[in-house]
Amino acid sequence: MNTSLKWIKALVPGLDCGVQEYVDAMTLSGSKVEGYEQLDADLDKIVVGQVTKIEKHPDADKLVICQVNVGSETLQIVTGAPNVFEGAKVPVVLDGGRVAGGHDGTKTPGGIKIKKGKLRGVESSGMMCSIEELGSNREMFPDAPENGLYIFDEDAPVGENAVAYLGLDDSVVEYEITSNRVDCFSVLGIAREAAATFHKEFVPPVVTETGNNEDVNDYIKVSVKDQDLCSRYTARVVKNIKFAPSPKWMQERLRAHGIRPINNLVDITNYVMEEYGQPMHAYDLDTIEGKEIIVRRAAAGEKFVTLDGQERQLDENVLMICDAKKAVGIAGIMGGENSMITDHVTTMLFEAACFDGTNIRKSGKRIGLRTDASAKFEKGLDPNLAMEAMNRACQLVEELGVGEVVGGAVDIYPVKREGVKLPFEPDKYNKLLGTDIPAGDMIGYFEKIDLGYDEATNEILVPSWRQDLLCDADMAEEVARFYGYDKIGTSLPSGESTAGGKSFKLRMEEKAREIAEFCGFSQAMTYSFESPKVFDKLLIPEDSKWRKTVVISNPLGEDYSIMRTLPLNGMLTSLSTNFGRRNKDVRLYEMGNIYLPKQLPLTELPEERMQLTFGMYGDGDFFTMKGVIEELLYQTGLRKKAQYDPHAELPFLHPGRKAAIVYDGAVIGYLGEVHPTVAANYAIKERVYIAVIDMPEIVSRASFDYKYEGITNFPVSSRDLSMVVPKNILVGDIEKVFEENGGKYLENYELFDVYEGEQIEKGFKSVAYSLKFRGKDKNLEESDITGAMDKILSGLKNIGIQLRG
């Protein structure tokens, strides 16, 4: 929201501070200021001058010598401007003055200083300016020539400050207005805040009654078919319209707000929209068939040509303004080409309404059109504003001589919105703020922002336009804003407090993050929504459960239209970005949800499951990733050996380098090398490894209860096993035999050799393990170890494994 400081000061007469003081104070009172632009910051010593005489330059065909009256004296100025003429009133920069930039519109920080000098041997004492050199442009000053000096109107006073005469002696302040403060999307709303901040009187315009003795109902009838989408519709008629430029003061304020002045009628609608925050629209009444306005939904497939000449495809959710036979406007967004105001209009219809903000936003998105008006409606306007803005516009019509306002107004307002009443509880406000502000001071703050106080009921009367004030905390915030956040000291919370702590689930997730970072992984955060095309990139079959997704009803676009059922796309996209930027040895992890619908179409919320995803390329391989997973399991209290199932259906992983992770009989995740085709789909030209852990499975088995055991004094006994193993038997199968048959003395086992070669029969491999046995309370005897080894060998034989001879 951009606002002219001069306009604010006109509504708050006692406000005489500079722009920096204003910005600082408004920010402290809660009206966050993003920045400001001082329009005349780089302009100095520029006056209105009048050319009294022109002579040819003796040594340059394209230059002329002008005598220019600047009020206090007549200066000689050499110029090459093609549009200079005797009698012209122009902006003149005096010797030592500054302009904002060049005539091509480029601005120079600090401006360009103008000095007296000679041009082709002839002395020149100053410079006459184009509008671009004054820091503006032809869009804001359409009467300015494309190439030449800016020519003032004949009434411009010679010798006066040209910057002030053009209205450039102003500052434009940019605010960040949150969506709950709809009232501040207007000059009046900001001015009310400024008056309260600086303890000055707020003087809004006094709107007087307008209209002749005729009845508007003789000119137009209105019916609203969809009152859920249009809570209020007001209309008035203006006849005998006379188009002319709007007055100088109005043009200056519109320019400061970035709005190009057009003519008196159009400028009034734009002016009122900025002043009140209420969009308005004008229709050529002679084009309204049947002299009837009908507010209804569009028909499915209906087409409509808007003011910009574009044909729009509509559906039944778009609200339309229609006459007896056709549509004449898209409600709250843009009028139609068929009812636009032209220079030949003599009678027009003014519209000010309150349309449903959500519908306006969705409609604009459907038809691909967003305007200044729709942006304001989207926020959710106060319907009580519509008639105030309408009457203000009609007042300006009469004051500026635009036309004759017909008496009366159409006002369809079936359910009036009232303000709310909140109990006045100063003790609660002080407790929330840690202050001791008197109740009388609080009431004073409320009255400054037009909140009433009913002494009989001890209630605060909140007007309908303050939709953000709903509870004690909101009222305490208003007290803090105008008491001054900078005056509130530091204090400890009063009252009783209860001990709290993080949940076990949260603590376990934090532990998992710590382990990931300990293993050299950096955290990534990616979107939870993605494109349906992701499944093709990941080689997911058409009938896969992973393709059953939650579809977003209002997506940002097709690429963000479903909720993810796999965490892989975000991780692979992040790895691809790093690879594309030539980053080497990248390790990333992400802790994020997947969304699994219980049934489709949705009848209840989908299941959200937290998953920990690892991804890496470069300095690691499958076994590096496996080691990371085993470290994670061990550090979270899962001390049993995990099993790895290579037969799991994981189409996005390499068929020979993948496995589901099985712990205690349950699948808790998967890991492997990304399928080469998938890696190519993500433009990664290295081997990529990923692992995914289902955190609920970890949390349900994890423990922070560590069991400490003393260091035994008894020695370890080792036995080496060299086996001939069929190739189809996995290492996990061998280790399962060790676990089941090793007995209580088997402390550890370690694979130290795998061999395939000439001395090994085809279809077999040689595998060697070192097994370590230790007693906790005694030295082991040979019989203890032999008994365990016999059971192990028997178990190995049962699955087709023999000792190597």
Regions found by a protein language model. Name each.
Residues 1-214, 349, 368, 372, ...:
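Phosphate-backbone binding interfaces of nucleic-acid-interacting proteins
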Residues 5, 24, 64, 202-302:
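Glycine/proline-enriched, intrinsically flexible loops and inter-domain linkers
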Residues 40-44, 211-212, 497-502, 526-545, ...:
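Beta-rich nucleic-acid/ligand-interaction surfaces
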Residues 48-78, 158, 263, 269-338:
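Conserved mixed alpha/beta core segments that line enzyme active sites in large multi-domain catalysts
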Residues 120-129, 133-135, 144, 148-150, ...:
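Mobile "lid/hinge" segments at catalytic clefts and subdomain interfaces of large enzymes
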Residues 189, 422-584, 719, 772-775, ...:
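Extended, well-folded interaction surfaces typified by the phenylalanyl-tRNA synthetase beta subunit core
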Residues 198-224, 401-429, 436:
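Terminal amphipathic helices with adjacent charged low-complexity linkers/tails
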Residues 448-451, 598-602, 607-608, 613, ...:
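A carboxyl-terminal module marker
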